[in-house]
Design a protein with these regions (language model features):
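A short acidic, Gly/Pro-enriched loop at the edge of an enzyme's catalytic core
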Residues: 1-9
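Short glycine-/acidic-enriched loop or helix-start segments at secondary-structure transitions
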Residues: 2, 20-21, 48-50
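Catalytic core of nucleotide-sugar-dependent glycosyltransferases
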Residues: 3, 26, 36, 41-42, ...
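A short beta-strand submotif of the Rossmann-like class I SAM-dependent methyltransferase core
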Residues: 8-12, 20
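A short, conserved alpha-helix within the catalytic core of class I
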Residues: 17-27
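Conserved catalytic/acceptor-binding region of the Class I
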Residues: 28, 32-97
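Conserved Class I S-adenosyl-L-methionine
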Residues: 71-160
Length: 160
């Protein structure tokens, strides 16, 4: 892309994968003066007991996979002259569907789980569904609302 040709760059559920100075410099280069960088993540609402139990089951499996909740992605914004945080908005939302749809299949799509052998994924699916049943009494085919907190960051390009 040509330099200073873009009004805004938006990254949803992804910036933690490429949170480095090289990426920030390239985004800064293509943004017009006073351009905007938006970063958005949906995070499981671990204030809810059954969601927290699922998160605790997932945590040991993460390894060194880049994750939003580790906060490591934020380090690239420390002491850099390219972007200024203008705002952070947080809001609650839910995804509703069957336990299998919005819990099991969603968790199985997580990068480090999707890379596992199918047999291990199926075992985890069963464990996820057991956790939900233990806390909520809901079977895989029952409807449930999975709570999330959305974090929306707005950065503005600092003029050169």
């Amino acid at each position: 892309l040509p330099s200073q040709s873009i009004d805004a760059v938006l990254s949803a559920q992804a910036f933690h994968w490429f949170a480095n100075m090289e990426s920030l410099k390239e985004i800064h280069r293509v943004l017009k003066p006073q351009g905007h960088l938006g970063l958005v993540w949906n995070q499981r609402d671990t204030q809810v007991d059954w969601v927290n139990a699922l998160a605790e089951r997932l945590s040991p499996l993460e390894g060194d996979t880049p994750r939003y909740h580790s906060g490591l992605w934020q380090k690239v914004f420390e002491h850099q002259p390219l972007f200024q945080l203008k705002s952070l908005h947080q809001f609650a939302q839910q995804q509703t569907g069957t336990v299998e749809q919005v819990v099991s299949k969603r968790l199985l799509s997580t990068s480090f789980i999707a890379a596992m052998p199918l047999e291990q994924q199926q075992d985890l699916k069963h464990q996820f569904e057991q956790i939900v049943q233990q806390y909520t009494g809901k079977q895989p085919q029952f409807e449930i609302s999975f709570p999330y907190i959305t974090y929306a960051y707005h950065f503005q390009k600092i003029a050169e």
